Amino acid sequence: KTFLLSSDLVSVREQVKKCDQFPIVLKRIQGYMGKFVDKADDADGVVEVVKKFWERGDDRFPIIAQEFVLSDSYRVLTIGGEVVQTALKKNKDWKATGTTSKTFEKFALDVDLKKIIKKVNKAIDIDICGIDFAKREDGSWILIEVNSGPAYDFFDDEFKMLIEKALRHLKKKAIRQKISKLVKLF
């Protein structure tokens, strides 16, 4: 349950009055490290958060509203569609970003999450991305967001390896594109 909010406050209030579930999470489509992410408990709270975002930022980037699920944060890093790292971010607060979580651990992908990751990678066509998930109490997964500029530093001992994988992937892609252009010339 994710939807794009209108760019005027009267319409925002009308949109969220139709919500059947609060609290909801609000976030700008552009942000980093949990900035421009907040939670609202009712329609008035949503309007206040939107105003706050608009006052804090130079631009009025679109804002999305998302179902709130109390969950740890599950990050999956993919390079070229391949899962190269998982990081479970635990936090006592409702917001479990890489900057607020102090400990990370790996987690195993279940069959359902593997299917979702495959669909997400196919749909977004981003070579290197971090995909964030939450988990409902019933065990079902919720896609929170896809980051096109993901962090590589959840585990210090993997940082160098991940950078090398990313560079190898990008180099191979650049070579394939160059060859493809050459083939078209002939």
Where are these regions (language model features)?
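A conserved helix-loop-beta module that forms one wall/lid of the active-site cleft
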Residues: 1-36
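Short beta->alpha connector loops
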Residues: 6-10, 68-71, 127
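Protein kinase-like catalytic core scaffold
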Residues: 24, 64, 84-85, 129, ...
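Anionic group-transfer/hydrolysis microenvironments
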Residues: 29, 68-69, 77, 132-134, ...
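Phosphate-binding site of ATP-dependent enzymes
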Residues: 35-124
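A short glycine-rich, hydrophobically flanked beta-strand micro-motif that places a catalytic Asp/Glu
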Residues: 66, 74, 126-138
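C-terminal active-site "lid" helix and adjoining low-complexity regulatory extension at the edge
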Residues: 108, 122, 126, 135-186
